[in-house]
């Protein structure tokens, strides 16, 4: 869904069902805040453990969203489904021991946190799935279709438009609604940040792990890379790439979870 279509759909929804829309935005905002804050806190905490107190001294190891949210990155996340927070300030000169190892750990900390949250929330959602739906619903659609972000029920679940007659335990829908939205958002943010484009984490991982820190950028190149990233985002090209990658990862993880829980 492109930006104009999403805005139009949300505008129509707000006009026709303002209460339902505002309830959804509470879920959506909570998922955004938690996802972005934990991503950046992870960077700062690992940097602190590696010897750099910069993030701690500047108050970035906090759950106060005002310290973390980047206006453009947050708007992008709302409109496009992926975005970023304010980068945590890191001073590599404070690192103890191996500089490249410490820098690599700091770079992957945010992505590792998002992937962990994705796995935990999707696993809990898999466990709750047979408790949420009437048995005939699961039999008709299949468990995976009711859990996948590409499945038939995802939109109905996260937008709160499921008929209670289909549910075995209606109150669980509120929990499942957040878990599936939270899982999808964390996976998208993780994959997005792994792209090897400055200023994303993937660039630092590539530079530290593969290039051994040999690639340096001046301010002009850094700004050019940021502009190129924004153009890719708003052109829709990046959305298509992310959807393919996240869809494949989610499908594989879901297959494993359904086998482990015996609910396939």
Positions of predicted regions on the chain:
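Hydrophobic transmembrane alpha-helices and their immediate loop junctions
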Residues: 1-264
